[in-house]
């Protein structure tokens, strides 16, 4: 019963907060707040810099592989478990999947800087 009350209160509170957050920002929209600020002067040019999508994709790929490699760091401590063959097989499969992902990115030229 306590779990049901907790879930109901949490759901109601979440719904209320999401509703408030959805409707509240639409009250005060000023064009001056949305424009870029250059020490009180009118902007000379657009403040939006061009962003390289290739850089973004390489960065995301790096973060994914870095996170997956970080999952391999506790592997030496896992070797102290009584069933080392299962640990070795799981780690070998994990590294194989990483290698396949890297090969896929490489063959599709996802790691190339220039085209």
UniProtKB/Swiss-Prot annotation:
TM helices/strands, residue ranges: 4-24, 55-75, 87-107
Subcellular location: Mitochondrion inner membrane
Primary localisation category: mitochondrion
Catalytic reaction list: a ubiquinone + NADH + 5 H(+)(in) = a ubiquinol + NAD(+) + 4 H(+)(out)
GO cellular component, one term: mitochondrial inner membrane
Keyword Lipid metabolism listed: no
Cited Pfam families: Oxidored_q4 (PF00507)
GO molecular function, one term: NADH dehydrogenase (ubiquinone) activity
Enzyme class per UniProt: translocase
Keywords: Electron transport, Membrane, Mitochondrion, Mitochondrion inner membrane, NAD, Respiratory chain, Translocase, Transmembrane, Transmembrane helix, Transport, Ubiquinone
GO biological process entries: mitochondrial electron transport, NADH to ubiquinone
Lipid bilayer topology: Multi-pass membrane protein
EC number: 7.1.1.2
PANTHER family documented for this protein: NADH-UBIQUINONE OXIDOREDUCTASE CHAIN 3
Family: Belongs to the complex I subunit 3 family.
Protein's job: Core subunit of the mitochondrial membrane respiratory chain NADH dehydrogenase (Complex I) which catalyzes electron transfer from NADH through the respiratory chain, using ubiquinone as an electron acceptor. Essential for the catalytic activity of complex I.
Subunit structure comment from the entry: Core subunit of respiratory chain NADH dehydrogenase (Complex I) which is composed of 45 different subunits. Interacts with TMEM186. Interacts with TMEM242.
Protein name as annotated: NADH-ubiquinone oxidoreductase chain 3
Originating species: Notiomys edwardsii (Edwards's long-clawed mouse)
Taxonomic placement: Eukaryota, Metazoa, Chordata, Craniata, Vertebrata
